[in-house]
């Protein structure tokens, strides 16, 4: 009887997680579609200037008002999703692939390479990430590409550590030992038996990392170390309006709300993916 109740509770919990996962996947897909088709859905050109309409408040004609050059803020926020979201996804993709590859090789082969890489990752993790990224971005100069590179340099160790710990656990497992006895090479064992089994934790880490990386990229742009004017990018737009926050608050609030909404959606999606892949819920699938 107790086992039946437990199974029912697990199924109810799993169904709720599935509903949440579907909802947040739809919301994330909607954000991506807006970014992809931004140029086709905006009412005005994001870089079209009209000084006669400078600093207009939100209205039926300009839903989020205009900036100091008369550019429509709604159009710039929507088009800014392309730079803000795609650069974030590119960053997370690069650091997850690189970190996973490095961590897997270190965990499998060990030795001097493992010691050196882990010491490098310790150094990267010892500093506050954004402070380290600020120093690197300042040396590289402004630009979205340089901001992505600066954050990539200090963000890959978390993936390397996850991949390394998972690889160490799998390396001594029975099915890997059987594959070794069957004559598989080291690279075959990594590609066929280890990587497929560590992708789950890596995926969860990457999903949870999207919101953080988006805020850090926006932070670098806000400090003029990322996207440069007149690029429509959320952090850069907030930087351009900060001096007029008290008199023309929509200049900061509009891109700020876009960042807030995107980060919340991706964070909740990451949390839900983590819950869905939790082994405690596997029996109810």
Locations of the language-model features?
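C-terminal transmembrane helix and the adjacent membrane-cytosol boundary/short C-terminal tail
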Residues: 154, 200-210, 249-285
């Amino acid at each position: 009887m107790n086992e039946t109740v437990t199974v029912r509770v697990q199924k109810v919990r799993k169904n709720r997680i599935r509903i949440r996962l579907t909802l947040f996947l739809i919301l994330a897909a909607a954000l991506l579609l807006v970014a992809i088709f931004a140029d086709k859905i905006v009412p005005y050109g994001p870089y079209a200037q009209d000084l006669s309409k400078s600093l207009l408040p939100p209205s039926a004609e300009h839903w989020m008002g205009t900036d100091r050059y008369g550019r429509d803020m709604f159009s710039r926020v929507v088009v800014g999703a392309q730079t803000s979201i795609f650069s974030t996804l590119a960053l997370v993709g690069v650091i997850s692939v690189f970190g996973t590859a490095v961590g897997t090789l270190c965990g499998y082969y060990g030795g001097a390479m493992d010691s050196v890489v882990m010491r490098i990752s310790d150094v990267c993790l010892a500093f506050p990430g954004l402070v380290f990224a600020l120093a690197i971005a300042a040396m590289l100069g402004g630009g979205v590409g340089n901001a992505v590179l600066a954050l990539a340099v200090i963000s890959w160790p978390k993936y390397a550590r996850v991949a390394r710990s998972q690889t160490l656990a799998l390396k001594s497992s029975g099915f890997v030992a059987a594959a070794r006895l069957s004559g598989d090479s080291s690279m075959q064992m990594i590609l066929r038996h280890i990587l497929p089994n560590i992708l789950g934790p890596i995926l969860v880490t990457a999903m949870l990392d999207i919101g953080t990386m988006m805020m850090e990229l926006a932070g670098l742009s806000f400090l003029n170390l990322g996207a440069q004017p007149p690029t429509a990018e959320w952090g850069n737009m907030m930087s351009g309006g900060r001096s007029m926050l008290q008199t023309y608050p929509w200049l900061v609030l509009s891109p700020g709300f876009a960042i807030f909404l995107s980060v919340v959606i991706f964070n909740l999606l990451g949390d839900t993916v983590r819950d869905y892949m939790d082994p405690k819920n596997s029996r109810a699938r």
